A protein has these predicted regions:
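Adenine-nucleotide phosphate-binding core of ATP-dependent small-molecule kinases
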Residues: 1-33
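Active-site proximal loops enriched in glycine and acidic residues that flank catalytic Cys/His/Asp
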Residues: 2-5, 16, 41-46, 95, ...
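Short, glycine-/Ser/Thr-/acidic-enriched flexible segments
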Residues: 8, 47-48, 98, 108
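Flexible, glycine/charged-enriched surface loops at secondary-structure junctions
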Residues: 30-38, 68-73
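Glycine-rich phosphate-binding loops at beta-strand->alpha-helix junctions
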Residues: 38-60
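A glycine-rich helix N-cap at a beta->alpha junction
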Residues: 62-66
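Glycine-rich phosphate-binding/hydrolytic loop that grips phosphoryl groups
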Residues: 73-110
Length: 110
């Protein structure tokens, strides 16, 4: 999608915008249901690796007092806080190991 957006593909840009808005809307629903949050965590494939997606999603959450540290947001492959120290909600990236989780669950069943 990024390559298509760079080539000026409007459908790709719309798909990207809908994805980011949908994630922010989903987060907002949980924020409302829980009457606020202390932290938001990005994980798994997109959450860990799609730096622009994280930035765009967080941009929708400004009403929560969330501010993004753009340098920290550029880090990949490690557990890191990507919000600024003065952000009212901590935002982090936590890498996952889905294969290990599946293995542990399987061992527990066997």
């Amino acid at each position: 999608i990024r390559a298509a957006i760079a080539d000026g593909n409007e459908d790709a840009k719309n798909a990207y915008d809908v994805l980011c808005y949908g994630i922010a809307k989903f987060v907002g629903g949980y924020v409302a249901a829980m009457n606020g949050v202390d932290a938001i965590v990005f994980t798994a494939g997109i959450g860990e690796n799609a730096i622009p997606v994280r930035e765009k999603v967080v941009s929708y959450l400004g009403y929560l007092g969330v501010t993004l540290d753009k340098e920290a947001n550029g880090v990949r492959g490690e557990e890191i806080v990507i919000s600024t120290p003065d952000s009212k909600v901590k935002v982090a990236v936590i890498p996952t190991n889905e294969e290990l989780a599946i293995c542990r669950e399987t061992v527990a069943l066997v």
